[in-house]
Amino acid sequence: MQVLSSLKSAKNRHPDCQVVRRRGRVFVINKTDGRFKAVQGKKKK
């Protein structure tokens, strides 16, 4: 899963990508191809 500061490019990478909000974070999920998962925020140290 990618950790990105902006999800605009992540949601346009595949037609099936959708933006969802879970646990106060914004995720991009793709049920047909799991390579396109992403989350918005900072990386953990």
From Swiss-Prot:
GO molecular function, one term: structural constituent of ribosome
UniProt superkingdom: Bacteria
Entry GO CC: ribonucleoprotein complex; ribosome
Pfam families: Ribosomal_L36 (PF00444)
Swiss-Prot/TrEMBL keywords: Ribonucleoprotein, Ribosomal protein
InterPro entries named in the record: Ribosomal_bL36, Ribosomal_bL36_sp, Ribosomal_L36_bact
GO term, biological process aspect, one: translation
HAMAP family per record: Ribosomal_bL36 (MF_00251)
Assigned protein family: Belongs to the bacterial ribosomal protein bL36 family.
Name of the molecule in the record: Large ribosomal subunit protein bL36
Species of the source: Psychrobacter sp. (strain PRwf-1)
Gene transcribed to yield this protein: rpmJ
